[in-house]
């Protein structure tokens, strides 16, 4: 550690957002650059703990070398911390920008003070590493002659593909959309991560030998069985795209859309891609977002930049406490109130709200009807005399995802599911089908980007063992 007393001398400083009046005018990333001297001060706050909980079981899922990387950064040698990040994380530029940072929730300094700004350090280290030319293709020593198909190009599929290509296998990654990236490409707004960040990494992967095929829907254009016959192993990383619906009267009205329908359209517009579906825009409209998570926040930020008239966000759950709840003691991820960039930009945010119906005129939504609820005895019950209605021109459903889409490839293959509806696998991430593996949200259910990367790496390890031995980890034990 560069300064043994740094954690006592310096206050936490996170990434600084651009002024609201400026950042809502465009789709550029909303954070301002941080000077190197300020980054070093933040790095000096790391205590180099004997037991670094930040990279433990309740911290970083990919087990980033956080104290080690911070120490190397403090020495001013950008190449070394760049390499340290890549030993555990294929895409620190993604997690540095998008991860909620469970590592910071588990930071020992966070027990009594604000935690170390780990995420902003990671972000700046990897971007500097790219700029300095320290991120280069990693080519295998030998080629195995084995072939692998990865279905789905989100962070899990990308991580698995890169790991397997580096192990010497021939990897083909299939994506149903017109561009690689999955949810990163069309689900995350550019003001959180501009898409050149993805393209920059894809160039490295292409040089490493990964073959990308877009516009191919496995299960339709190519059947699952055809894929199994063509490749020695198959990895399923299609995410958890089955959105949670709102089965209430009025759901069919125009102006009521799933969050991903809305976000995908704007991401395509930002990329200069023509939108052929009926346009969904918040310009000049009264917008209500149902769902209080990150996706809901992304909808709000998008609505602000499109020029909405007003914005509201309703959450079914009660308002979290302002600081760490006793139900999530350190080093667990703290349950507490968080205010996002979109909330700063303007939003009427309400908790304990249940939407009961939507009404409209000439087929277009005009009002949302709901009531307040309280959570008692394990269920939500309406608060007496709390019914209300609110004008609405655009209602966006951002209530999360229930799991992978089963109808199509998964059902046709005959994979088994667990009790949550995700694809069931053994300890090597193999499904009930020989040579067919699953990882990321397809296997875990909707989760964090850092978990997707971790699962992609683990699935790749399982596939690699299978290709080398012809057996999964479970089969090898028998």
Segments the model singles out, each with a brief description of its role:
Residues 23-42, 64-97, 101, 112-142, ...:
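Ferredoxin-type iron-sulfur electron-transfer modules in oxidoreductases and energy-metabolism complexes
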Residues 4, 13, 18-37, 42-45, ...:
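C-terminal catalytic lobe of FAD-dependent flavoproteins
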Residues 252-284, 376-446:
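FAD-site-proximal beta/loop scaffold in flavoenzymes
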Residues 5-32, 44, 63-75, 82-85, ...:
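Beta1-alpha1 glycine-rich phosphate/pyrophosphate-binding loop at the start
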Residues 296-300, 442-467:
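A conserved FAD-binding loop/helix module that cradles the flavin
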Residues 143-156, 282-293:
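Beta1/beta-strand and adjacent pyrophosphate-binding region of the FAD-binding site
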Residues 142-143, 147-151, 199-248, 356-370, ...:
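Feature captures the FAD/FMN-dependent oxidoreductase FAD-binding
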Residues 46-60, 95-99, 103, 107:
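Short cysteine clusters
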């Amino acid at each position: 550690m560069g300064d043994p007393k740094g954690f006592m001398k310096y206050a936490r400083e996170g990434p600084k957002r651009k002024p609201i009046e400026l950042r809502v005018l465009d789709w550029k990333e909303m954070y301002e650059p941080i000077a190197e001297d300020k980054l070093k001060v933040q790095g000096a706050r790391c205590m180099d703990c004997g037991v670094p909980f930040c990279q433990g079981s309740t911290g970083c899922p990919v087990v980033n070398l956080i104290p080690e990387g911070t120490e190397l950064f403090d020495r001013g040698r950008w190449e070394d911390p760049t390499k340290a990040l890549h030993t555990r994380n294929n895409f620190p530029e993604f997690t540095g920008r998008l991860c909620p940072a469970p590592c910071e929730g588990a930071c020992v300094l966070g027990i009594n003070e604000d935690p170390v700004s780990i995420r902003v350090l990671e972000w700046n280290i990897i971007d500097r590493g790219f700029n300095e030319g320290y991120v280069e293709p990693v080519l295998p020593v030998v080629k195995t002659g084995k072939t692998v198909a990865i279905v789905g190009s989100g962070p899990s599929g990308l991580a698995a593909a890169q790991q397997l290509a580096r192990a010497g296998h021939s990897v083909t990654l299939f994506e149903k959309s017109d561009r690689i990236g999955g949810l990163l490409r069309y689900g995350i707004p550019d003001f959180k991560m501009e898409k050149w960040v993805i393209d920059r990494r894809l160039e490295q992967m292409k040089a490493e030998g990964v073959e990308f095929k877009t516009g191919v829907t496995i299960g339709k254009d190519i059947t699952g069985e055809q894929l199994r016959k063509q490749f020695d192993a198959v990895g399923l990383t299609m995410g958890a795209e089955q959105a949670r619906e709102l089965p209430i009267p009025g759901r069919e009205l125009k102006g009521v859309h799933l969050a991903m329908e809305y976000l995908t359209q704007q991401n395509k517009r930002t990329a200069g891609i023509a939108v052929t579906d009926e346009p969904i825009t918040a310009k000049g409209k009264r917008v209500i977002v149902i769902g209080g998570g990150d996706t809901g926040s992304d909808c709000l930020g998008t609505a602000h930049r499109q020029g909405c008239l007003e914005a509201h966000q309703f959450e079914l759950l009660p308002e979290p406490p302002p600081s760490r709840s006793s139900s999530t003691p350190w080093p667990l991820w703290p349950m507490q109130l968080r205010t996002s960039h979109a909330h700063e930009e303007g939003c009427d945010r309400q908790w304990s709200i249940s939407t009961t119906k939507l009404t409209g005129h000439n087929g277009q939504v005009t009002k949302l009807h709901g009531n307040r609820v309280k959570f008692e005895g394990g269920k939500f019950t309406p608060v007496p005399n709390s019914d209300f209605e609110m004008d609405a021109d655009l209602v966006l459903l951002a209530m999360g995802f229930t799991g992978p889409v089963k109808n199509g490839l998964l059902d046709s293959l005959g994979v088994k599911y667990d009790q949550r509806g995700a694809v069931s696998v053994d300890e090597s991430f193999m499904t009930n089908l020989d040579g067919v593996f699953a990882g990321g949200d397809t296997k875990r259910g909707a989760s964090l980007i850092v978990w997707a990367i971790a699962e992609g790496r683990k699935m790749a390890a399982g596939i690699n063992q299978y290709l080398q031995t012809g057996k999964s980890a479970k089969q090898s034990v028998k």
